[in-house]
């Protein structure tokens, strides 16, 4: 008989080789800034917990960001040797003095082994599995941890057709098919992923968890889906409102004298280069439309950032560069011609 747990705390740990993108992915899943991101090894030095989702019943899902593996081969040997006194001494005492990063790795992995329910193992998809020498050693580390593993393919590059993505995922599945601890392989780029991929991840996590977590995890998964769907629908509504406002926006162009028309034509063909055209009614109307579009776009950007739990600045220069170059100007028809 399986005992159900209702107020469970389920722990997920993101692990990977150093500088693969663990903290970036954690930020994406958490929808908030955590830790430090830099293009160097060993930026994260401790295992840190972050609440991912919770429900009224008391169930919680916790995401742990961990230090990246450095020398995976030596680290695997250290972990495997911890069961004997000399191995323990080297790992706990010697490495603490002589190899601080390896000592921190061991402390973090001991914690992962003791508390984690599912391990999320991040790899660099830009490399072929057989061309990533650290993977074999890190599979030994994950086997030592002894928890179910879901492999996530990061750094997938530009979005590609679904068939190509499936082939890439299958290539990694084939390379890891001898590893019993690996329960699934998924594409999960920290930048190019979408919420549908997150749903697939949550499905895989549920299948990897022990049966006692079935009910609380179902509640957590449902809450996560609703949270993500709400953000998606709010984002879609905001974008739709912006597009609709731009499509229906217009500005009246004032009529100009014959002399001003001649000057405008002359400037357009290279004559009157120094002519003052600040009074050009068409330019005034275009400027008015662009300013409204800029204001609305900045409002949209702030709304999308808030809805999706992001921070940062948006640079709309490219968009408004195109707006200033692409125009449709409708003119009133002559009454005499309209009567024909």
Indicate where each model-derived feature is located.
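Conserved G1/Walker A P-loop phosphate-binding module
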Residues: 1-88
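Conserved NTP-handling cores and scaffolds of large molecular machines
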Residues: 29, 33, 70, 120, ...
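Hydrophobic, Leu/Ile/Phe/Ala-enriched alpha-helical segments that form helix-helix packing faces
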Residues: 29, 33, 172-176, 205, ...
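Alpha-helix N-cap/loop-to-helix initiation residues
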Residues: 43, 128-131, 194
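Short, conserved acidic/polar surface loops in the N-terminal third of protein domains
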Residues: 73-77, 131-132, 161-164, 198-199
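Conserved C-terminal guanine-recognition region of P-loop GTPase G domains, centered on the G4
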Residues: 83-184
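Canonical P-loop GTPase G-domain recognition
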Residues: 155-223
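Extended helical scaffolds that flank P-loop GTPase cores
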Residues: 195-198, 205-340
